Amino acid sequence: MANGAEDVVFCRGTGQSDDSDIWDDTALIKAYDKAVASFKNALKGEDGATPQENDNPGKKRKNNKKNKSRKRCNAAPDKEWQVGDSCYAFWSEDGNLYTATITSVDQEKGTCVVFYTDYGNEEEQNLSDLLTEPPDMDEDALKTANVKETESSTEESDRSFTPQKSGHAKHKSKSNFPMGPPSWFPSFPPGPPPPPPHFKKMDGRRGEGPGPSFPGWPPMIPLGPPMIPPPPPMSPDFGEDDEALGSMLISWYMSGYHTGYYMGLRQGRKEAAASKKSHRK
């Protein structure tokens, strides 16, 4: 170690390291510049095509106006429109064709008031502008009309289905409810019969239990033991040994209480079984 202390292990910047080409990111920079240049060229191409696209809507609008004028020229001039007739009219705000119904006609002025069926609006139209059928309806207007017809048909079907559905619901509700209390809980037996006239009360010791047991029925199981009487009080002057002794006595007391309660339950069941056998005899 002392002899090689002055030897040079690595010198930064000499380029003699085997992994010196790792820090050469020239290819990465060229790829990035190429991608940015292609993206800019694409943006320039879109900007050059934008004015042409902006010119197209104007031409389309002119074509739409020409088509609308042609449609209006296609209207039948000899038709005598009357109140209640169905027709197609162009709405003044958007210029689209919609289904309408004539509500009033003014033959002197050559105008009428139409009620747009799908939207509920009213507007005054010239009788010459009304159409009996849409000859060359625009795609957007045709889609709108189809959507409205579909919605109206679905609403009618829903209305027609509603009473039937309610009838089925009523039928189901009637069938789901039981006819009487016995069918609510089929797994439980019915209530006990009234006691016979010759039934005698239990003695005082048994009367303190959960309740009388009827003949032919098993004894009723109590819900739980009554309140446990409090343990005897302890003096606060007890030491550690006295505390341990007191804890032991309390545990014996509680154990004896629960043991007596359990034995009492067993004795009560035996007496109930014996009385049941005697009644059968």
From Swiss-Prot:
The modification Phosphoserine is found at S17, S20. It comes from the Eukaryota. The modification Phosphothreonine is found at T14. InterPro entries: Smn1 (IPR040424), SMN_C (IPR047313), SMN_G2-BD (IPR049481), SMN_Tudor (IPR010304), Tudor (IPR002999), Tudor_SMN_eumet (IPR047298). Residues 1-20, 42-77, 145-242 are annotated as: Disordered. Residues 264-279 are annotated as: Required for interaction with SYNCRIP. The keyword DNA damage does not apply. Its main location: nucleus. Homodimer. Component of an import snRNP complex composed of kpnb1, rnut1, smn1 and znf259. Part of the core SMN complex that contains smn1, gemin2/sip1, ddx20/gemin3, gemin4, gemin5, gemin6, gemin7, gemin8 and strap/unrip. Interacts with ddx20, fbl, nola1, rnut1, syncrip and with several spliceosomal snRNP core Sm proteins, including snrpb, snrpd1, snrpd2, snrpd3, snrpe and ilf3. Interacts with elavl4. The SMN complex plays an essential role in spliceosomal snRNP assembly in the cytoplasm and is required for pre-mRNA splicing in the nucleus. It may also play a role in the metabolism of snoRNPs. Required in motor neurons and proprioceptive neurons to ensure correct U12 intron splicing and proper levels of tmem41b mRNA. Required for the maturation of motor neuron axonal branches and dendrites. This is Survival motor neuron protein 1. It comes from Danio rerio (Zebrafish). The lineage of its organism: Eukaryota, Metazoa, Chordata, Craniata, Vertebrata. The gene is smn1.
